[in-house]
Amino acid sequence: MTENRQLGALLAACHWIGEKGWCPATGGNMSLRLDLAHCLITESGKDKGSLAAEDFLLVETANNHVPSGRTPSAETGLHTLLYRLYPEIQAVLHTHSVNATVLSRVERSNALVLQGYEMQKSLSGQRSHLDAVVIPIFDNDQDIPVLAQRVAAYADNRPLQYGFLVRGHGLYCWGNSVVEARRHLEGLEFLFQCELQRRLFDVNSNVDVKPNVDVNPNVEAK
């Protein structure tokens, strides 16, 4: 019964993500842990806004084997890696939003640091806007096992929290339930949009643009 409720919650989250436009053109993938050895993940090439329960495939987390023989998402290995690394993770959401895609390219370092935003508290455990939330950025790679190795190497030295970005690709985020994963996704997307807007304003504020009219309120019109 719990599994059915969680899958229902994940389907609702997928439809909501589709409405947001965060997984265009069948992009992205979503998964749900069943137990320590298995998860459900979206089948390759499915529109996330119109998914049904039968569009989720059973996968063995130890080796990415799909008993049904159907084709899961190409990035299944990143989902199963997260389930192996962190037993508390119950759901993983991977989206391709414009904000995540652009920010991951604009930020040249290996992490996006979010600080000063009240909405950081949408992320579990965050208590103050003064703290820094670090979202790692990994260079994109079509070889998913290689990309998974880089993520695992990072996690060996510093625990992953909330999510990570793949440069020019999108966001992976998770939670200890579908509800928490969805909240983390919504919170991070809001923070990404704020950060992108802030950077755009910073760039524009450095451009010397002279107004075409005199806007001094103390000057009388002639």
From Swiss-Prot:
Entry's EC annotation: 4.2.1.109
Cofactor(s) annotated in UniProt: Zn(2+)
GO biological process, one term: L-methionine salvage from methylthioadenosine
Pathway assigned to this chain's UniProt record: Amino-acid biosynthesis; L-methionine biosynthesis via salvage pathway; L-methionine from S-methyl-5-thio-alpha-D-ribose 1-phosphate: step 2/6
Annotated positions binding Zn(2+): H94, H96
Keyword Endoplasmic reticulum in annotation: no
Alphabetic keyword roster: Amino-acid biosynthesis, Lyase, Metal-binding, Methionine biosynthesis, Zinc
Cofactor note: Binds 1 zinc ion per subunit.
A GO CC annotation given for this chain: cytoplasm
Transmembrane segments: none
GO MF, any single term: methylthioribulose 1-phosphate dehydratase activity
Reactions catalysed: 5-(methylsulfanyl)-D-ribulose 1-phosphate = 5-methylsulfanyl-2,3-dioxopentyl phosphate + H2O
Keyword Lyase recorded: yes
Gene3D superfamilies: Class II aldolase/adducin N-terminal domain
Stated family: Belongs to the aldolase class II family. MtnB subfamily.
Known function: Catalyzes the dehydration of methylthioribulose-1-phosphate (MTRu-1-P) into 2,3-diketo-5-methylthiopentyl-1-phosphate (DK-MTP-1-P).
PANTHER family: METHYLTHIORIBULOSE-1-PHOSPHATE DEHYDRATASE
Protein name, as recorded: Methylthioribulose-1-phosphate dehydratase
Organism: Yersinia pseudotuberculosis serotype O:3 (strain YPIII)
